[in-house]
Curated annotation (Swiss-Prot):
The keyword Phosphoprotein does not apply. InterPro entries: Cystatin_dom, Cystatin_sf, Prot_inh_cystat_CS, Prot_inh_stefin. The lineage of its organism: Eukaryota, Metazoa, Chordata, Craniata, Vertebrata. Coiled coil: none annotated. This is Cystatin-B. It comes from Pan troglodytes. CDD domains: CY. Keywords: Acetylation, Cytoplasm, Nucleus, Protease inhibitor, Thiol protease inhibitor. This is an intracellular thiol proteinase inhibitor. Tightly binding reversible inhibitor of cathepsins L, H and B. Able to form dimers stabilized by noncovalent forces. PROSITE patterns: CYSTATIN. The keyword Repeat does not apply. Gene3D superfamilies: 3.10.450.10.
Length: 98
């Protein structure tokens, strides 16, 4: 993977779900709602001064959200940050940089 270029979309892994779970409360607070389902479906990653994860998450019914989560470099010892998100996404919507 080139530094700065997002990876190809991949199926979500247990690690991806763990990352999504760690920022779930940040999203629920910003949206002022609790999601009955929060299942990571797919993701892309981008190496920067740390890693950006773009994660498609199923949040119930036919509703999806796209998350951009930043993970700092290991030596910085900082928590994951929900950098940005997009709501009202569908299952077929492609993960893109936002």
């Amino acid at each position: 993977m080139m530094c700065g270029a997002p990876s190809a979309t991949q199926p979500a892994t247990a690690e991806t779900q763990h990352i999504a779970d760690q920022v779930r409360s940040q999203l629920e607070e910003k949206e002022n709602k609790k999601f009955p389902v929060f299942k990571a479906v797919s993701f892309k990653s981008q190496v920067v001064a740390g890693t950006n994860y773009f994660i498609k998450v199923h949040v119930g019914d036919e509703e999806f959200v796209h998350l951009r989560v930043f993970q700092s470099l290991p030596h910085e010892n900082k928590p994951l940050t929900l950098s940005n998100y997009q709501t009202n996404k569908a299952k077929h919507d492609e993960l893109t940089y936002f």
